[in-house]
Amino acid sequence: MLSIDEAFRKFKSRLELNEREQKNASQRQNEVRDYLQTKFGIARSFLTGSYARYTKTKPLKDIDIFFVLKDSEKHYHGKAASVVLDDFHSALVEKYGSAAVRKQARSINVDFGVHIDAEDNTDYRVVSVDAVPAFDTGDQYEIPDTASGKWIKTDPEIHKDKATAAHQAYANEWKGLVRMVKYWNNNPKHGDLKPVKPSFLIEVMALECLYGGWGGSFDREIQSFFATLADRVHDEWPDPAGLGPAISNDMDAARKQRAQQLLFQASQDASIAIDHARRGRNIEALRAWRALFGPKFPLS
């Protein structure tokens, strides 16, 4: 029988990117880039966001791809943010169809129609990508933001560096804990609305909420993490790079209240699972953790 620690380590491993998934992500990046280059002047593209920071969870959805535009596309920079997104949307609809392409606040999402089975497996394939138009301004990037109607500054390298530093300061367990909570956040049991939006907000909060160093126990770390997230989800969480709008701006008061309730319930459910293990009920503890997280949490 799996010990609780063994189960968590197996769970962590299941949420990590493997070689086949990375290969498919690269193929999808090249596919979308090669097509968009027939429609726009693309200087280069690169995989970014949580995928590049190794904090992306499973199933592999909404992988960010920056498409850095050439100077020939500078006319977009002086227009409302929605203009370039509308044009990206129209171009991608031509290739993938309107049912597979949707506009988002700062990107265009392309769904590849990949089936997700009952165990959250996708045959190592990427479910969807987010195509993000961007301009390189020298020391940072600017991307369109429809909420403000403007181009906003961002620096994915700063985000990546902060995640790396946090991971190292937490005995190299920080990213695993973040992926676990993101996996919980993606659970279909929450309905159409994820508790925390964007999922990057979980990562931003973790920069402060996971503090004091790794305590050596996944179950207690996760319980404490959920509890602290619940306590602080109403706070304003600025961009860690100090450039763009607050990461927490996507959530209004009602959504934050719902998130707080669900995060608190998760911390309570974690406490129940811990109590099962403390009383020697290992099978019940594993089942409780699986009920909390979803099918990627192992029972054996």
Swiss-Prot record:
GO terms for biological process: defense response to virus; nucleotide metabolic process. It comes from the Bacteria. GO terms for molecular function: ATP binding; diadenylate cyclase activity; metal ion binding. It is an enzyme of class 2 (transferase). Its EC number is 2.7.7.-, 2.7.7.85. Crystallized with and without Mg-ATP. Activated for cAAA synthesis by Cap7 (also called HORMA2) and by Cap7:Cap8 (HORMA2:HORMA3). Does not require dsDNA for activity. The CdnD:Cap7:Cap8 complex (also called CdnD:HORMA2:HORMA3) is deactivated by Cap6 (also called Trip13). Its cofactor is Mn(2+). Pfam families: SMODS. Keywords: Antiviral defense, ATP-binding, Magnesium, Metal-binding, Nucleotide metabolism, Nucleotide-binding, Nucleotidyltransferase, Transferase. Mg(2+) binds at residues 62, 64, 130. ATP binds at residues 50, 53, 56, 154-159, 182, 199, 245. InterPro entries: CD-NTase, NT_2-5OAS_ClassI-CCAase, NT_sf. It catalyses: 3 ATP = 3',3',3'-c-tri-AMP + 3 diphosphate; GTP + 2 ATP = 3',3',3'-cAAG + 3 diphosphate; 2 ATP = 3',3'-c-di-AMP + 2 diphosphate. Gene3D superfamilies: Beta Polymerase, domain 2. Cyclic nucleotide synthase (second messenger synthase) of a CBASS antivirus system. CBASS (cyclic oligonucleotide-based antiphage signaling system) provides immunity against bacteriophage. The CD-NTase protein synthesizes cyclic nucleotides in response to infection; these serve as specific second messenger signals. The signals activate a diverse range of effectors, leading to bacterial cell death and thus abortive phage infection. A type III-C(AAA) CBASS system. Cyclic nucleotide synthase that upon activation catalyzes the synthesis of 3',3',3'-cyclic AMP-AMP-AMP (3',3',3'-c-tri-AMP or cAAA) as the major product, and 3',3'-c-di-AMP as a minor product at pH 8.5. At pH 7.5 also makes 3',3',3'-cyclic AMP-AMP-GMP (cAAG). Binds strongly to ATP and much less well to GTP. The 2 domains are closer in the ATP-bound enzyme. Interacts individually with Cap7 and Cap8; forms CdnD:Cap7:Cap8 complexes with stoichiometries of 1:1:1 and 2:1:1. Belongs to the CD-NTase family. D05 subfamily. This is Cyclic AMP-AMP-AMP synthase. The lineage of its organism: Bacteria, Pseudomonadati, Pseudomonadota, Gammaproteobacteria, Pseudomonadales.
